[in-house]
Amino acid sequence: MLIVLSLGGSILAKNLDPDRFLKYADVLRKLSKKHTLLVVAGGGEAARNYIDTARAVGADEVTCDYIGIEITRLNAHLLAAALGPDACPEIPTNYLEASKAIRPGKVVVMGGVTPGQTTDAVAAILAEFLRADLLAIATSIDGVYSSDPNCDPSAVKYDKISPEKLINIVMAIEMKAGSKSPVDPVAAKIIERCKLDALVMDARDPVQLEEVLDREAAKKSPISCGTWITTKI
């Protein structure tokens, strides 16, 4: 199975803790022995801090985007270092490079690509480009809700959801000040466009990430820590 994983910087690079990188690397190493695996690393708090500082000194938004991309690539380098010989030696900077980097048993690790796109969007486009079997969005949220659960205590979690419904929810959440959707709007559009099977899951525990991707990916069964996005409902 070819899996593209968007690994959120908020969980991978939290406090830039080396142990977290090593734990995720261990999980990815095991998964790569059974699946073809490409990982897009997010920027997390470090990216947000750099972008905030860039804005404060007068940088335009495109420059801020490029700074964020560089931070995601630094996180990708750290994860690749933690993987050691089990990672492809080069960090791809575009989709074609990523496709050419695929090797049996090796994990391809990359960061952002284009200004204006989150790493979730990059992962979705990469999954479409490679015709991946699964796009997994690993984050600190345990799935897709009817609204932002941090702002709305009555929000309902979905076990499965169609791409069309996902877009409606994401756009509604993004319109509300202070709310944050679990999937980037561009990523949601890509998922709809290519009819891609996707999973949004809580992966703060690296072991949980391994269990879900390894045991559940082929079954598309409901999981407690995530939401399936699929046309097969």
UniProtKB/Swiss-Prot annotation:
Superkingdom of source: Archaea
Entry binding sites for UMP: G43, D65, V113, T114, P115, G116, Q117, T118, T119
Pfam families: AA_kinase
Annotated GO CC locations: cytoplasm
Pathway membership: Pyrimidine metabolism; CTP biosynthesis via de novo pathway; UDP from UMP (UMPK route): step 1/1
Record keywords: ATP-binding, Cytoplasm, Kinase, Nucleotide-binding, Pyrimidine biosynthesis, Transferase
InterPro entries: AceGlu_kinase-like_sf, Asp/Glu/Uridylate_kinase, Uridylate_kinase, Uridylate_kinase_arch/spir
Binding sites annotated in the UniProt record for ATP: G9, S10, G44, R48, T139, Y145, D148
A GO term for molecular function: ATP binding
Location of this chain's protein in the cell: Cytoplasm
Reaction(s) catalysed (UniProt annotation): UMP + ATP = UDP + ADP
Single Gene Ontology BP annotation: 'de novo' CTP biosynthetic process
Keyword Kinase set for record: yes
EC top class named in words: transferase
Assembly mode: Homohexamer.
Protein's recorded name: Uridylate kinase
Organism: Methanosarcina barkeri (strain Fusaro / DSM 804)
